[in-house]
């Protein structure tokens, strides 16, 4: 599946191979790496996992291929992921980080209710959402 983000987004998003490697590394934390598809067409990928230490789910990655951005796929995928986590009910919140300066990511996650929690790490801004 040839997925790629826009050139200006490359510094902010992990390559899909790294996403899969991260899923394997976090397999003990019930990691979930998924391809996002419309019909038979791959439009993106996502990765999330459990984090008992934080009493939260961690959304490690969510990206939509550059050719399909702006069509609502990211919003729909995030809504489905969050609904599944709410139904599961193992943890009360979701935590994510985005690279400082990635205003598109910040705005995207804010529209879905995520708020900065000021537990930032190096050049990454941490946000969370109460389920």
Label each region the model flagged.
Residues 1-60, 65-67, 78-88, 116-122:
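Acetyl-CoA-dependent GNAT
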């Amino acid at each position: 599946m040839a997925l790629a983000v826009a050139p200006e987004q490359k510094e902010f998003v992990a390559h899909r191979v790294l996403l899969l490697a991260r899923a394997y590394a976090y397999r003990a934390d019930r990691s979930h790496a998924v391809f996002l598809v419309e019909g038979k067409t791959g439009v993106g990928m996502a990765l999330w996992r459990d984090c008992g230490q934080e009493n939260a789910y961690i959304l490690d990655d969510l990206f939509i291929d550059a050719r399909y951005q702006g069509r609502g796929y990211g919003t729909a995928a995030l809504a489905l992921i969050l609904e599944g986590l709410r139904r599961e009910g193992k943890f009360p919140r979701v935590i994510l980080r985005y690279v400082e300066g990635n205003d598109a990511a910040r705005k995207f996650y804010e529209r879905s209710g995520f708020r900065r929690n000021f537990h930032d790490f190096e050049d990454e801004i941490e946000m969370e959402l109460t389920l």
